[in-house]
Amino acid sequence: MEKLLRLCCWYSWLLLFYYNFQVRGVYSRSQDHPGFQVLASASHYWPLENVDGIHELQDTTGDIVEGKVNKGIYLKEEKGVTLLYYGRYNSSCISKPEQCGPEGVTFSFFWKTQGEQSRPIPSAYGGQVISNGFKVCSSGGRGSVELYTRDNSMTWEASFSPPGPYWTHVLFTWKSKEGLKVYVNGTLSTSDPSGKVSRDYGESNVNLVIGSEQDQAKCYENGAFDEFIIWERALTPDEIAMYFTAAIGKHALLSSTLPSLFMTSTASPVMPTDAYHPIITNLTEERKTFQSPGVILSYLQNVSLSLPSKSLSEQTALNLTKTFLKAVGEILLLPGWIALSEDSAVVLSLIDTIDTVMGHVSSNLHGSTPQVTVEGSSAMAEFSVAKILPKTVNSSHYRFPAHGQSFIQIPHEAFHRHAWSTVVGLLYHSMHYYLNNIWPAHTKIAEAMHHQDCLLFATSHLISLEVSPPPTLSQNLSGSPLITVHLKHRLTRKQHSEATNSSNRVFVYCAFLDFSSGEGVWSNHGCALTRGNLTYSVCRCTHLTNFAILMQVVPLELARGHQVALSSISYVGCSLSVLCLVATLVTFAVLSSVSTIRNQRYHIHANLSFAVLVAQVLLLISFRLEPGTTPCQVMAVLLHYFFLSAFAWMLVEGLHLYSMVIKVFGSEDSKHRYYYGMGWGFPLLICIISLSFAMDSYGTSNNCWLSLASGAIWAFVAPALFVIVVNIGILIAVTRVISQISADNYKIHGDPSAFKLTAKAVAVLLPILGTSWVFGVLAVNGCAVVFQYMFATLNSLQGLFIFLFHCLLNSEVRAAFKHKTKVWSLTSSSARTSNAKPFHSDLMNGTRPGMASTKLSPWDKSSHSAHRVDLSAV
């Protein structure tokens, strides 16, 4: 019976429902394998239905509680949930593992999945966990076993690769002193020796884990299992291996459904003469049909765990290695691999599978000469598998690979001279591309945890070297002999840009993959960086394994005191600037009826003031928004537009000033529409283009602004730098003209105050030309604290400077305000209403109609100047 368990994550909870019956029979003549003696010692055995390729035992002594489906063990669906029932002892070792004593308990079964159904999973019934017992689950590309003892509130959990579409043997043992151990296909896969306290694990009155996740969007996964066995003791590793080989028929692969692997014409699982030839052939054929990376990974893992313990010739070892690595390489080319590789556990599991195959090849490699070496290169990796007698090697060290800028060296004295050594080396060509986005908290690198928000990434090839027996190495990094690891860096353009950015600090770690816990974890214990730069690193290590250089880019941060001070300056300065800009706009609006204030220059001042006002108000609001949210993204777009508009109107200010002081380009009316198009139209165009290509770069980092990492910030920086450069050029040209006029006035009239005119003009022009933003360019480095303070102060107070220089201290505005107050005063008097005359700009210049001015300003005293410039033009 291959009962389908229609669950995405199916749970097998063993309940106690004991039927007191015995089944008698006779042993099959073929069942004289010692592994069946291990099976005969079981306390409970359910062979279920006959499965081709899995051997069963018929009990002749009646010592095993044996049953069929719906007798002693049965499957039942309730409300869409498949439940697995058996036995009901309230004080049994099986029901309560804590009562097992020192002998422990063992559970064993064969398991496979059979694809997915299109309909959604029904709602889980209850959704609780069992009070006592264990759980087996397969979900999201990972299998797991959990065991719980309620009396002391302890939980043991271990993860392993799920079975995939082929029969896989899963067995786990538990002892109170040894914890949980999980064996896959007769080999120890993972363990949890210590467990953890879990007092809230389920409810005390719940008997059964209810069968599926509460996820309506997922689809069903058909599962099947066979040969369910319980021993009320923990089997030894030898017993587990013996039973496994007996069940599958002496080293045969696991499934009759495996595509003709090790199958004769009669479909009997027997070993062919060349044990490895069918594996190589099948890998070659299966590679042509690869479609789903997840399924193929499970298939390759089954192959790696089921290789026969037979010797390999050099040619067979070479063919098997090349074929297996080619199959792995083609997985990386599948469309679904990129998404699957985002789970680091999948990538590390693949590396572990490759290590298993290469270790098997090295341990079974035999040759007629003292030194046997099988080496080559594929699209996946360079490899070398060698069996050497160190005393026959004349070199002072063993190096893999022999050529290239990335290699590992072992000193000759580290080898056991009179013992055969097997050496396996792998230099992966592209695996480092999938070793990115590593959270420091998920590693054993203590230094990286100081910057937990900054991810690590592999910046070199992944290189592996294993030697058996292990070389004798110093356990002290200051001693000898030690392993030397030399790796060339392989930075992408983006990584190189981040690493060379002066506002970042780069940390480099000599790291290795630690599989001691059953899962690969990056660590740097026993390794030290001795030298290197941005292109390479050299490490010394006390052990061998998989090595890579990990890099961590950390943005430089100001001290907390500077951060608080700069933040306070920004808040206070922007708030004061907003008030002053409001006052400026109100002043221009009130005086708009006066002819001198109605001209184009003050229209430009008003538009600049409005753009800066809105930008700074939005900036103050953005400080309160959460990055990554929709309001923050909308705010980032608005900030981008209005700050660009502010810069555009600063450019208009510069061009208009240039036209007034240096050249005359035509009437003001003819330039009016161009100025408005430049001030409001160009920024809108830039924002639309930026949104079209980098919409995800708005408000997604640590603030409501453009992303620096994606390069979208250049949609603001490039136009801003252009405006700054142009306006600095205009400021220099205008300053030269003003300086010339001042010098002429001093020569002719001897007026020393004329020299003050240059300084005054520069002070008046700086706020409207935006040249103070140059301090923002100088403040990009975290060390330039003084420029950051200057930038924060000058730009947060831009509105204040505009109000001071272009309202309070502007002679035209003051004169217009005086005239306006007179008009208001005269308007209130009925005596002068009929005789009131229109106001003209002549009054602003201190003259009356028909009369010449009797007082010249410093601008007018130079009769030799090529330009007669009114002071108000500045």
Swiss-Prot record:
Result of altering A816T: Reduces cell membrane location; decreases G-protein coupled receptor activity
Mutagenesis or variant effect for T245I: Does not affect subcellular location; does not change G-protein coupled receptor activity
Listed result of changing R560H: Does not affect subcellular location; does not change G-protein coupled receptor activity
Known outcome of mutating W174S: Reduces cell membrane location; decreases G-protein coupled receptor activity
Effect after changing W773A: Decreased activation by 5alpha-dihydrotestosterone. Strongly decreased G protein-coupled receptor signaling. Strongly decreased G protein-coupled receptor signaling
Residues on Extracellular side: 26-567, 624-632, 696-710, 781-783
Keyword presence, Amino-acid biosynthesis: no
Variant or mutagenesis effect after changing L608M: Does not affect subcellular location; decreases G-protein coupled receptor activity
Effect of V508M: Does not affect subcellular location; does not change G-protein coupled receptor activity
UniProt-reported outcome of changing E626K: Does not affect subcellular location; does not change G-protein coupled receptor activity
GPS: annotated segments: 510-557
Consequence of substituting V270M: Does not affect subcellular location; does not change G-protein coupled receptor activity
UniProt site (Cleavage): L544, T545
Impact noted for substituting E78K: Does not affect subcellular location; increases G-protein coupled receptor activity
Induction: Up-regulated by hypoxia in hypoxia-inducible factor 1-alpha (HIF1A)-dependent manner.
Impact after mutating D751E: Does not affect subcellular location; does not change G-protein coupled receptor activity
Phenotype for N476S: Does not affect subcellular location; does not change G-protein coupled receptor activity
Consequence recorded when altering M242T: Does not affect subcellular location; does not change G-protein coupled receptor activity
Effect of A241T: Does not affect subcellular location; does not change G-protein coupled receptor activity
Effect of R673H: Does not affect subcellular location; does not change G-protein coupled receptor activity
Assembly with partners or alone: Heterodimer of 2 chains generated by proteolytic processing; the large extracellular N-terminal fragment and the membrane-bound C-terminal fragment predominantly remain associated and non-covalently linked. Interacts with ESYT1; interaction takes place in absence of cytosolic calcium and inhibits the G protein-coupled receptor activity of ADGRD1.
Protein name: Adhesion G-protein coupled receptor D1
Source organism of this protein record: Homo sapiens
Lineage: Eukaryota, Metazoa, Chordata, Craniata, Vertebrata
